Amino acid sequence: MSRSKKTRKGGENSPKQQPRVKKQDRAEVTGKRAEKGNKSGSRHNEALIQAQAPQKKAAQKKDPRHGSKKPVALALPTTTEKSATPKVKQPKLTDEQKLLKLEEDPRLNQLLDMLEEGRNLSDADQKWLDQQLNKIEALMIKLGISDELEDEAPAKSKADSDDDLFDRFESGAELLKDYQDKF
C-alpha cells in the first residue's frame, strides 16, 4: 500500500476561507491607531507640556512626584536633656510598718491558708512564701519580737525526762477522772 502524506487542506467538508484582501485595502481599514496614555518622559518634561497647553498652566501647578513631601532629617536628632520634675521621694517605712505590710499581704495569707488545708504549692509559690517568711522573721528578730510558742517549746524539751513525762501523764489521768465525776 502506498503512503499518502496528510495535508492541511480540508477538502469539500472544510470551512471556507475568506477571500484575500489586497494590502492597500487593509491599510485603509485599520488607519492610524488612537494614542493612549502620556508620552514618554511626560513626568520629567513638565515645562514642555505646559508650553503646549497654556490653558492648563494656571489650573495645575503641582509636583509630579508621588509620595510624601514632608522633609526627613538625615542626621540623628540631638538629645536635649529634659528638665523633668524630680520624683517625689516617699518616706521610708519603719521596720514596724514593713512588718505590718508583709503580714497583711493577701497573697501570703492565701498561701498560708492553702498550706493549712494540706494543699501542695507550686515551686514558685513555695519559694516566694519562704522568702516572705524569712523577711518577716528577720524583721521580728530586729524588732525584738518573738513567738511565745517557740520560746515555751525548747524549755519543755530540756526539762523533760522519762519520770517527768510519766508524772504528767498520771496527773492528766487524775484530772480526767475529776472532770468526769463533776458531770
Swiss-Prot record:
Instruction: List all Basic and acidic residues biased stretches.
Output: 22-46, 92-101
Give one Pfam family, short name only: YihI
Q: Name one GO molecular function term.
A: GTPase activator activity
Q: From the UniProt entry, list the residue stretches annotated as the region Disordered.
A: 1-101
Report the domain of life of the source organism. Bacteria
Which keywords annotate this record? GTPase activation, Ribosome biogenesis
Please tell me whether the keyword Transit peptide is annotated for this protein: no
Q: Which GO terms describe its biological process?
A: ribosome biogenesis
Keyword hit for Protein transport: no
Supply the InterPro entries for this chain.
YihI
> What biological function has been recorded for the protein in this entry?
A GTPase-activating protein (GAP) that modifies Der/EngA GTPase function. May play a role in ribosome biogenesis.
Complexes and interactors: Interacts with Der.
- In which family does this protein belong, per the annotation? Belongs to the YihI family.
Per its record, how is this protein called by name?
Der GTPase-activating protein YihI
> In which organism is this protein found?
Shewanella oneidensis (strain ATCC 700550 / JCM 31522 / CIP 106686 / LMG 19005 / NCIMB 14063 / MR-1)
What is the gene name?
A: yihI
